[in-house]
């Protein structure tokens, strides 16, 4: 999967199109990511020990990884990602600028 936790991404399709956010969690087996402030849904929480009040919460739901693009940190634009080997390590590289995305 080309998206990792902590990446800044742009949503390219769906109800939250053109929104940007940081990846909070990535689920490679399901090909889904949770993006901060994107795909917010209302969750009905029953009262329990942790939250005795309960109520309706707004939480981010996962979206499919094909609906987001990584934002290139050098120019701030959405870009495709390629994998290259640098110094014997597999790293992610921006296809627009050739900049290495991994820290």
UniProtKB/Swiss-Prot annotation:
The keyword Cell division is assigned to this record: no
Alphabetically ordered keywords of this record: Ribonucleoprotein, Ribosomal protein, RNA-binding, rRNA-binding
Record protein name field: Large ribosomal subunit protein uL24
Tagged with keyword Nucleotide-binding: no
InterPro entries: KOW, Rib_uL2_dom2, Ribosomal_uL24, Ribosomal_uL24_CS, Ribosomal_uL24_KOW, Translation_prot_SH3-like_sf
Organism in which the protein naturally occurs: Enterococcus faecalis (strain ATCC 700802 / V583)
A cellular component term, taken from the record's GO annotations: ribonucleoprotein complex
Family of this protein: Belongs to the universal ribosomal protein uL24 family.
